[in-house]
Amino acid sequence: MPRFVDRVVIHAKAGTGGHGCASVHREKFKPLGGPDGGNGGRGGSVILEVDPQVHTLLDFHFHPHLQAPNGTQGMGGHRNGANGDDLILKVPDGTVVLDDDGRILADLVGAGARFDAAAGGRGGLGNAALASRARKAPGFALLGEAGAEVDLTLELKTVADVGLVGFPSAGKSSLVSVLSAAKPKIADYPFTTLVPNLGVVTTGENSFVMADVPGLIPGAAEGRGLGLEFLRHIERCAVLVHVVDCATLEPGRDPVSDIDALENELARYQPTLQDDSVLGDLADRPRAVVLNKVDVPEADELADFVTEEVSQRGWPVFKVSTLTRDGLRPLTFALWEMIVAARAARPEPVKTRPVIRPIPVDESGFTVSADPQNPGGFVVRGVRPERWIRQTNFENDEAVGYLGDRLARLGVEDELLKLGAEPGCAVTIGDMTFDWEPQTPAGVDVTMSGRGTDARIDKTDRVGAAERRQARRVRRGQVEPE
């Protein structure tokens, strides 16, 4: 079973908002209590948060499908539904969030860094919130909206100061084990290291993090060996260290050719954070060369022979032995000085006043176009019309009538008439297709009344206040009867 996972694909689904409640207040001696249905609760959101105690994406490897709780339904007595709890997913420091197209959505660095992966759906309004002068006791409520549903790729890029690169069995894991308290797997065969190993190196009163990545071989860019994918863990490293095996017996290999081969593979790697990292490209990172295994006499002689040639590249060269621990102390202090110099060379972050710029959403706009798949039909697109469709309970005639009133006030009906829509033609809004029937001809003033009634044709025997005043004046002889 894998214990270290640095790349996973997750499917996150936010909670659905609770439905609104259609309720009428019932109380003794109050025959007209009015609507008292509460609103539905908001669905829970899916949030990624950095936790320093988490070091791998292993949990998401076994449980990639994640869903936040739904909001609860509103109830009578003006009781709103409870909001769904947010689902907070703990991720390691250095996690990069990418979408389906490979675009970076967030780079989570630092304890407590957060990213809203999927927003919860809004709750539906109860009939108390829908009451108006024309519709005093609505017999319907709005449905809750579904939460966002996304597929995200999480990549872990280790946060370290020094990255060790080299051929397999060059002694990288051994170097980490003797410089820190880390206990990586060490064996006398290549590709012993399959996952990055981190260790904290102490230099006097200072300390830094060192990362050991699996070995590189020529042709890794084409997939040989373990490939180049694990090099994502050195993208954040301020200093790169070439660990060279001076005691290798493989034909055709020497320290200089090994360094050239490593540089060639590093140049072919395309960092994901190249445009976003303040450290710049990998080719611009400070480098050091560690000539390892000088406890072997032949290796010590070879190290002395190539030191001058390697130094001409402008990189510091160190002769060390992880077995006898010779040369380790000067190496650690030199690496710390390189880290300090690299940090000082970084551009100072400009402290600017945080400005929140929400993504503009045109909720008032909509478009009406001919339906290419249904001759004679039309398609209505817009944030508000499509949301209203999702919130409507089509089993309730009054709710459907309320939807028609909202679309008419928005101007959808007039736009359909301008495009030559005929009564009975198919109109698609969101996932719903229905036969369109205009409420009134275009240009006619609409008399506002409750759904299901028409003040222009409905007659009532109820005597109004104006009629009672007129009758009282006639009885008193103040006016002549009509």
UniProtKB/Swiss-Prot annotation:
A GO CC term attached to the entry: cytoplasm
EC number: 3.6.5.-
Main location: cytoplasm
Pfam families listed in its UniProt record: DUF1967 (PF09269), GTP1_OBG (PF01018), MMR_HSR1 (PF01926)
OCT domain boundaries: 358-438
Residues of the OBG-type G domain: 160-340
Obligatory cofactor(s): Mg(2+)
Top-level enzyme category: hydrolase
Binding site for Mg(2+): 173, 193
Residues binding GTP: 166-173, 191-195, 212-215, 292-295, 321-323
Annotated Obg domain residues: 2-159
Top-level taxonomic group: Bacteria
Example GO BP: ribosome biogenesis
Assigned keywords, A-Z: Cytoplasm, GTP-binding, Hydrolase, Magnesium, Metal-binding, Nucleotide-binding
CDD domains according to UniProt: Obg
Biased composition (Basic and acidic residues): 453-469
Chain positions covered by the region annotation Disordered: 441-482
Localization in the cell: Cytoplasm
Self-association state and partner proteins as the record states: Monomer.
Function: An essential GTPase which binds GTP, GDP and possibly (p)ppGpp with moderate affinity, with high nucleotide exchange rates and a fairly low GTP hydrolysis rate. Plays a role in control of the cell cycle, stress response, ribosome biogenesis and in those bacteria that undergo differentiation, in morphogenesis control.
PANTHER family, sorted: DEVELOPMENTALLY REGULATED GTP-BINDING PROTEIN-RELATED (PTHR11702), MITOCHONDRIAL RIBOSOME-ASSOCIATED GTPASE 2 (PTHR11702:SF31)
Annotated family: Belongs to the TRAFAC class OBG-HflX-like GTPase superfamily. OBG GTPase family.
Protein known as: GTPase Obg
Organism, scientific name: Mycobacteroides abscessus (strain ATCC 19977 / DSM 44196 / CCUG 20993 / CIP 104536 / JCM 13569 / NCTC 13031 / TMC 1543 / L948) (Mycobacterium abscessus)
Gene from which this protein is expressed: obg
